[in-house]
A protein has these predicted regions:
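N-terminal localization/anchoring segments of enzymes in phospholipid and broader phosphate metabolism
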Residues: 1-375, 379, 383, 423, ...
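Glycine- and other small-residue-rich loops at beta-strand/loop junctions that grip anionic moieties
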Residues: 206, 393-394, 428
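Thr-Gly-centered strand-to-loop micro-motif
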Residues: 391-392, 449, 468-469
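Helical hairpin unit composed of two closely spaced alpha helices linked by a short loop
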Residues: 394-416, 420, 425
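Short glycine/threonine-rich loop-to-helix capping motif typified by GTGT followed
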Residues: 403, 429-433
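Catalytic-core elements of nucleic-acid end-processing and repair enzymes
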Residues: 457
Length: 539
């Protein structure tokens, strides 16, 4: 169906714009104001009422503490001993010890409330079963693993982990990987690939916001749905508070698009809301897949400016490795239904002519006890010999990752991080800077991108390995979010990733291990970072 013909057919259901895109929302019917005065506002109001009621109960209970002081002290002492002997990250232990010391009763209750998995036990069991199903449906080709082992034994060990406890994701050959150094570059290719869809299109994104980017994508999706292509869209429930109305899935369904919202906002206090779907996955016919840092909103393609220029990165896969991206999408889509792996993962995928090297897309689930994203990063740091170059928007490190960064630099590896010169959030920006001095003194190089905000999540190592995905260097990504990434070995695109790092570096300010260089006279920011660092794992 031609675009002009399609727009004529749906003009009574959408607004058509000169940029070629379509919109479902009227101007002004979005954002924080809409959320406050709409159904989402009611949900939040009920949520805060519950919080106030819980705090009232805590206050009443705390009033009894003087009468039960001996028991309270003993209970707190038991909690301290429990924390010190737990397998929790040391930074998280310190945080909880601080909280319990400041508010003993409330702190203990909060700890057990979060540890008790209130609201997501069933989800945890379901995801565990889906992970087992994924491993059965994605067999590892033994010859591929042997060839990887012959080229790089350390990389083969990482592949073994990803195939096993890392979620059941194999390493593939017969896959071409294209690297995009900006959201604009990804957007242009994404539109071209969407036009080729014949069977299905799967989209899973953390953020969707109406504007030029989503409008152009939505026009193609709706047109393809009218042609009989099966289109599925899934986005994180936080969009209901920030960008989209609660009835947006129904609006998409009127265009023939099936839509789900991950963890929508509900008026119940639960730790379940702490786990967000931060993934950015697009799969077309099981043959082409995209992932990376780029969401479907205009700031990601610099059509609007929020924090100066926006620097991002993404990759496109063509070939066998797309199977894993398809599985990652289906894991989330099929949480409440029978999995559809058989229907979508058994189709033959032709190998692109230019396919070389190895690729392993993988997901990270915060509920399986495996910190896959962090362990992959640490493994790359430990195996680096010449250099490891990193782009990340945030730097809120636990002890293990900070030690790995320092140790790599102390071994003589060129460890270089590029972070934003203009932050999107002040508190994470302040927390990042609290790590600078210790890292720099160990030999780690840190640079800040002067033109604006770096949102890319990129590791490139020794001209041989790279990771591009959604996983930030902060607690939320490493512990609390559903994430995904692609690990590559000897892929032809790896020199392009390193070239992008070097080009970005030319617009950066080198940071030195001095108070003036790190904080640039921002005393309030420095105090904020020092104060908040004690509770960083909770942010």
């Amino acid at each position: 169906m031609k675009p002009e013909e399609f727009k004529q057919n749906v003009k009574d259901r959408v607004r058509v714009f000169e940029d070629g895109g379509i919109r479902l929302l009227k101007k002004g019917k979005r954002g924080i104001i809409r959320a406050i005065f709409g159904r989402t506002g009611l949900v939040l109001a009920l949520f805060f009422v519950q919080v106030l009621l819980l705090l009232s109960v805590f206050r009443w209970f705390t009033a009894l503490v003087p009468h039960l002081l001996g028991g309270s002290i003993a209970f707190t002492a038991v909690m301290v001993i429990y924390l010190l002997n737990s397998d929790m990250d040391n930074s998280a232990k310190i945080t909880w010890l601080v909280v319990i010391a400041l508010v003993p009763v409330l702190g203990v209750v909060l700890f057990w409330w979060t540890k008790g998995e209130v609201g997501h036990r069933m989800l945890k069991r379901r995801l565990k079963q889906l992970a087992q199903d994924t491993q059965e449906q994605l067999p590892q080709d033994a010859q591929t693993l042997e060839r990887l082992k012959a080229q790089e034994s350390g990389a083969a060990s990482l592949a073994y982990y990803l195939r096993g406890k890392g979620g059941g994701f194999p390493v593939y050959e017969n896959t071409a990987v294209t690297y995009f150094p900006s959201g604009e570059a990804k957007f242009a290719e994404l539109l071209r690939q969407l036009e080729k869809a014949k069977q299905y299109i799967f989209l899973e994104y953390f953020i969707i916001d109406e504007g030029l980017m989503w409008g152009r994508v939505l026009e193609v999706l709706a047109r393809k749905a009218a042609e009989g292509v099966h289109v599925r869209v899934m986005y994180d429930g936080t969009c209901e508070f920030t960008t989209l109305p609660r009835d947006y899935p129904k609006r998409l369904e009127r265009l023939g698009i099936t839509c789900k919202v991950f963890s929508p906002l509900m008026p119940f206090v639960s730790t379940h809301y702490n786990y967000r779907d931060h993934r950015k996955v697009l799969v077309i016919d099981g043959k082409v897949g995209f992932t990376g840092g780029v969401n479907l909103a205009d700031e990601y393609i610099n059509h609007v400016e929020k924090f100066g220029r926006w620097k991002d990165a993404a990759v496109m896969l063509e070939g066998e490795a797309v199977r894993s991206l398809t599985a990652i999408f289906l894991q989330m889509w099929d949480i409440a239904r029978e999995p559809e792996f058989e229907a979508y993962l058994k189709q033959p995928i032709p190998a692109p002519a230019e396919a070389k090297g190895f690729a392993a897309p993988y997901g990270d689930c915060p509920l399986d006890g495996e910190r896959v994203g962090e362990l992959v990063y640490i493994d790359l740091l430990n195996r680096a010999r010449k250099y490891i170059h990193i782009m990340t928007p945030y730097l809120i490190l636990d002890g293990e990752l900070e030690t790995a960064l320092k140790f790599a630099a102390e071994r003589g590896v060129d460890v270089h991080l590029i972070l934003p010169g203009k932050p999107d959030k002040r508190i994470p920006y302040a927390l990042a800077k609290t790590h600078y001095a210790a890292l720099i003194r160990s030999g780690v190089k840190i640079s800040e991108w002067v033109p604006g905000f770096v949102h890319a999540k990129v590791f490139v190592v020794d001209d041989r390995e790279a990771v591009v995905g959604t996983i930030n260097l902060d607690y939320r990504s490493l512990y609390h979010h559903f994430e995904d990434a692609v690990w590559m070995v000897d892929a032809p695109c790896i020199p392009a990733i390193e070239d992008d790092f070097q080009r970005t570096l030319t617009q950066c300010r080198a940071v030195e291990a001095t108070k003036q260089s790190i904080w640039q006279g921002q005393t309030l920011l420095r105090l904020t970072g020092r104060l908040v660092k004690a509770i960083a794992p909770l942010l």
